[in-house]
């Protein structure tokens, strides 16, 4: 493996499955890409894996950046094809935010017994907080009807720049409350540019890459 590519165990799931990340490049600007926060959204995992493979084969393409790709944040949910982790927690409601709430409108949104209770969330919180490796941007791949590029924190212009390449609608509100979300934690409270990139459900990886690759490259190079 190249000196500019490092495979990391950033943590473990509830069932002790390693959560793997790949750091590509040693540049000063740090950018994170996540897939599989929700295990029943395989389209985002496939896109993150495709991106990881592309960047590893073209590691000099963005030599001034430090890119971290975590394709499967929720490996237990991904294996079980469930939104939640092995304890039934929606990881995107478990981040330690000021707006965290113990209430859930449906079981699929269960936020856990307390904020940051889940090992998968703890791994991402630790990764985001690494000294001298704090990301300037975070792109989290999901899948939803309708497709959209949702933003939190100082990411509106970034989202709009990405949308120029595929026409995905840009939204500042996903349409329903998301207390304890990654966007609230990293975007609104940590002032990191966070994009939740929502692919159409059941899209093939070939079509997802066709629609998304240039938008992703723009996100990497965009100066926000």
Regions picked out by a protein language model, each given a short descriptive name:
Residues 1-22:
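Short glycine- and acidic-rich boundary segments immediately preceding or forming the N-terminal edge
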Residues 7, 21, 69, 138, ...:
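Conserved beta-strand scaffold positions in the cores of enzyme catalytic domains, especially
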Residues 16, 38, 56:
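Active-site beta->alpha N-cap acidic-glycine motif
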Residues 24-30:
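Proline/glycine-enriched tight loop/beta-turn segments at coil->beta junctions
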Residues 28, 42-50, 56-175, 192:
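Active-site/substrate-binding loop(s) of hydrolase catalytic cores
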Residues 33-40, 44:
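Active-site histidine-acidic residue metal-binding/catalytic motifs
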Residues 37-38, 108-114, 198, 202-205:
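Second-shell loop/turn segments in exported
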Residues 148-150, 176-224:
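Active-site-adjacent mobile loop/cap segments within catalytic or ligand-binding domains
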């Amino acid at each position: 493996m190249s000196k500019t590519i490092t495979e990391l165990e950033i943590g473990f799931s509830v069932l002790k499955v390693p959560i793997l990340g790949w750091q590509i490049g040693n540049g000063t600007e740090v950018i994170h890409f996540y897939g599989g926060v929700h295990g029943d959204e395989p389209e985002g995992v496939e896109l993150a894996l495709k991106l990881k493979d592309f960047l590893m084969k073209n590691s000099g393409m963005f030599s001034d950046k430090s890119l971290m790709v975590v394709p499967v944040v929720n490996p237990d949910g991904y294996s079980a094809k469930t939104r939640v982790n092995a304890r039934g927690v929606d990881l995107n409601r478990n981040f330690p935010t000021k707006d965290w709430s113990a209430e859930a409108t449906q079981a699929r949104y269960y936020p856990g017994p307390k904020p940051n209770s889940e090992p998968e969330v703890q791994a991402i919180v630790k990764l985001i907080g690494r000294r001298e490796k704090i990301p300037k941007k975070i792109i989290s791949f999901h899948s939803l009807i309708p497709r959209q590029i949702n933003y939190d924190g100082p990411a509106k212009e970034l989202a709009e720049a990405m949308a120029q390449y595929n026409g995905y609608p840009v939204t500042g509100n996903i349409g329903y409350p998301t207390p304890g979300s990654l966007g609230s934690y990293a975007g609104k409270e940590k002032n990191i540019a966070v994009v939740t990139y929502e692919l159409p459900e059941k899209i093939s990886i070939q079509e997802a890459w066709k629609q998304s690759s240039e938008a992703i490259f723009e996100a990497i190079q965009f100066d926000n």
